[in-house]
Amino acid sequence: MLSSCNEHTNKSTQQVNKDTIQKKSNPVVYFEIPVIDMERATRFYSTVFNFKFDTTIIDKNEMALFPFTEEKSGISGALAKGEIYKPTKDGVLIYFNTANMDETLRLANTNGGKILYPKTDNSIGLVAEFEDTEGNRIALYQSKE
């Protein structure tokens, strides 16, 4: 009887621990944006968002890593160039945070991007979408605060 009680308790504890761990972290931890021309793409994202990239090679693919700090919320990722990476407007949509939607859209448009969905005020903030220099659809978000 005691062993079956402990077995049940252990299973329950394992489930609670797993649930707690899953609730303490965001489900998405990393992203990669496909690029054709790494220099053009890093110049675009550096200009539009004022990002500084660290570059590296991972599994024979060129990567330009977006800035990341453990102290801030959110995830990070990379611009990725390689045979397996194909830019698209039809796939996953990544939202970048911005403090000034109008300026970010202006910079995207004047640096080779195209506005796909104009600034729109929805119930949680401002959103917009643009095509980057590589042909990817990228979204913007600005909070109402």
Region spans (language model):
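Short beta-strand micro-motifs in enzyme catalytic cores
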Residues: 62-64, 92, 126-128
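Mid-chain, well-packed structural core segment of small domains
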Residues: 87-108
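Vicinal oxygen chelate
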Residues: 6-26, 30-33, 54-57, 105-145
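C-terminal motif of bacterial Sec signal peptides marking the signal peptidase cleavage site
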Residues: 2-4
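Core segments of cupin and vicinal oxygen chelate
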Residues: 22-28, 32-74, 110
